[in-house]
Design a protein with these regions (language model features):
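N-terminal export leaders
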Residues: 12-32
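Paired acidic/hydrophobic, glycine-rich loop segments that form the ligand-binding mouth/hinge
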Residues: 93-98, 262, 279-284
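Extracytoplasmic ligand-binding site segments that recognize negatively charged/polar headgroups
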Residues: 55, 107, 112-268
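Short beta-strand-to-loop elements that line the ligand-binding cleft
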Residues: 72-78, 97, 257-265, 301
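Early extracytoplasmic/lumenal segment of secretory-pathway proteins
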Residues: 42-109, 270
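N-terminal secretory signal peptides
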Residues: 1-15, 38
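Hydrophobic residues within well-ordered alpha-helices
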Residues: 86-87, 271-276, 316
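Extracytoplasmic/periplasmic substrate-recognition and gating elements
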Residues: 283, 287, 292-326
Length: 326
């Protein structure tokens, strides 16, 4: 497992994304949990947090220290390493800053404890997406592990997810966004309108998708369905036959040389696009911004099939107790 401790960079990268609860923001440093500032001042507390580089930013730790007097030690990993650490090293952290799709892997192991919503001051400000799966009343609920499907437990000691909101939340939601294809409009030479465009022979050897298996296979599913190769009942809960077809598709596309590379980190995606080695790839919106900041044309391209969405939040270690838990 590869980890890197964050150095001071200020707010950047995917911190440009939407906050999941309007005033809630981060659980620490924003008043989400309240009523204990005097205790904290008398008993200095250090909390260990790990998660992806998306949101483990030194500026957040600095704000937490300034507002609450709590020292927040942050360690950044990639998504796969975050899931592995959450399960296999539960004594190494107090706060797990992870994505919702990881919860199905993590919660059954008992390493994260349910969170009493009555202790969350701004719980009523959490956007509906994390409570019922809809941004607006007429929104269509997404396929896959939508945050609300793993957002609650029936009780404080339950090991299964609740179908409706309860008093016990799995995590405080913090950020969410929807990803699509990033393109070099100066190099693609035509309009890009569908996920299927990434398989255009004209782009052979100049495309890329994400090399995090649980997310990259969703890229492949969006592409395959857009091409008319398959119609998934639920892309986030594939049958064995659907998985086999999707993997076979990826293997053939790679063997045919369609992909220049598979990227795993923010910087990799930026470098591939900025260098011109890749002209169309699955991409995060702040990575597009990073390419533009270099004076290079890059576009976060809307597609007719829609976006691949995601969300993340803060979970509490089952080992947290007493003042540290508060």
């Amino acid at each position: 497992m590869t980890e890197t401790t964050k150095t001071a960079k200020g707010i950047s990268r995917r911190s440009l994304l939407k906050t999941a609860s309007a005033a809630a923001g981060r659980a620490a440093g924003s008043g989400v949990v309240t009523g204990f500032p005097t205790i904290w001042a008398q008993n200095p507390i250090t909390l260990r947090q790990f998660g992806t580089g998306v949101s483990n930013l030194n500026a957040i730790a600095e704000k937490c220290k300034a507002d609450l007097g709590i020292t927040l030690e942050m360690t950044a990993t990639d998504s796969d390493a975050a899931a592995q650490r959450a399960v296999t090293q539960p004594k190494s952290y107090d706060i797990a800053d992870i994505e919702y799709w990881i919860l199905k892997k993590v919660y059954p192991t008992g390493v994260i404890q349910p969170m009493d919503v009555k202790k969350l001051k701004y719980y009523d400000k959490v956007v509906p997406l994390f409570k019922n799966g809809k941004l607006k009343p007429d929104s269509v609920i997404a396929q896959g592990t939508a945050p609300h499907t793993v957002g609650y437990f029936e009780s404080a000691d339950a090991k299964t997810f609740a179908k409706q909101p309860t008093d016990w939340m799995t995590m405080v939601p913090t950020i969410y966004n929807a990803d699509t294809l990033g393109i070099r409009p100066d190099l693609v030479g035509r309009d890009i309108t569908t996920w299927a465009d990434i398989m255009d022979p004209a782009f052979k050897g100049k495309t890329s998708i994400l090399n995090i298996p649980s997310i990259g296979i969703m890229d492949a599913a969006m592409i395959m369905e857009a091409m008319g190769n398959i119609k998934y009942a639920d892309k986030g809960n594939m049958t064995k036959e659907e998985i086999d077809k999707t993997i076979d598709f990826l293997i053939k596309a790679k063997q045919d040389g369609q992909f220049r590379a598979f990227w795993k980190s923010f910087d990799e995606s930026v470098n591939l696009m900025a260098s011109g080695e890749v002209v169309i790839q699955s991409m995060w919106s702040p990575a597009v911004t990073a390419v533009r900041s270099k004076g290079i044309a890059c576009k976060f391209q809307p597609l007719k099939e829609g976006y691949r969405s995601w969300g993340g939040g803060l979970g509490l270690s089952s080992g947290l107790k007493g003042v540290a838990l508060d």
